[in-house]
A protein has these predicted regions:
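Bacterial N-terminal signal peptides that target proteins for export
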Residues: 1-8
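Non-globular, low-complexity intrinsically disordered regions
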Residues: 64-66
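Consensus positions within tandem repeat domains that build extended binding/scaffold surfaces
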Residues: 92-95, 115-118, 138-143, 161-166, ...
Length: 226
């Protein structure tokens, strides 16, 4: 059984999963723990396997996914837009950290933030489909994703945190919108040789990238104006 992340102290959750057996599209009620995390099984299936999620309720009424579990190995994970009627707005920290099976992750248009180390060392990850305006990439969110060849962020991205896109050795093309206001200078090292960063000409994003290149002459990046 493949786990999205190791979680300690979830004995009740394990018992719940074992009670589901091999039934398909099982529905699990809201079993909220004292820390305000709840167990949810979505009706979305890929082939014959359901994906179980643990979510964390956020103050704005949306949820963050901080754990997932599948009954069989799956190379594609499509994150749902909603869990139990609540909008999924965040990919929780370390959700896919160290994952060695998933090749494609499909994010819904509702996601606004990708948490700390969310895809850290997800070494088999080849593709992330981003359809909505993700605003924040937290620290080390894509660190060490050695199978990624391209990342494309739509308009709306504002912040790229510390080492968010670093040590992605196969990454050759990164597409950034002109909306990026903050890029930590500890990014883009140990990526493709060179890493081509596609940005709108004359944008704030391009100006920030130029500053980073001046302060770190060892970075092997190429700005491609579009």
């Amino acid at each position: 059984m493949k786990k999205g992340k190791i979680v300690l102290g979830l004995c009740g959750f394990c018992l719940l999963l074992s009670s589901c057996g091999s039934s398909q599209n099982a529905t699990v009620g809201n079993n909220t723990d004292p820390n305000n995390h709840s167990v949810s099984t979505t009706s979305m299936s890929r082939e014959t396997s359901d994906i179980q999620y643990l979510k964390k309720d956020l103050e704005n009424g949306t949820v963050s996914i901080w754990y997932f579990e599948t009954s069989t190995p799956q190379d594609t994970i499509a994150i749902p837009e909603e869990i139990n009627g609540k909008t999924v707005s965040q990919i929780g920290e370390r959700l896919f950290e160290g994952n060695e099976e998933v090749k494609t992750v499909i994010l819904p248009k509702t996601v606004r933030a990708i948490g700390n180390s969310a895809f850290n060392f997800a070494t088999t990850l080849e593709k992330v489909e981003i359809s909505g305006p993700v605003e924040i990439l937290e620290n080390s969110s894509f660190y060490g994703c050695n199978s990624l060849q391209e990342l494309n962020f739509p308009d709306g991205l504002k912040k790229i945190g510390d080492h968010a896109i670093t040590a992605c050795s196969s990454l050759t093309d990164l597409y950034l919108p002109g909306t990026v206001e903050e890029i930590d200078e500890d990014n883009f090292a140990l990526c493709g040789e060179p890493l081509k960063i596609h940005v709108p000409a004359g944008s704030e994003t391009e100006a920030r990238l130029q500053e980073i290149m001046k302060s770190n002459g060892d970075l092997n990046i190429q700005i491609v104006e579009e």
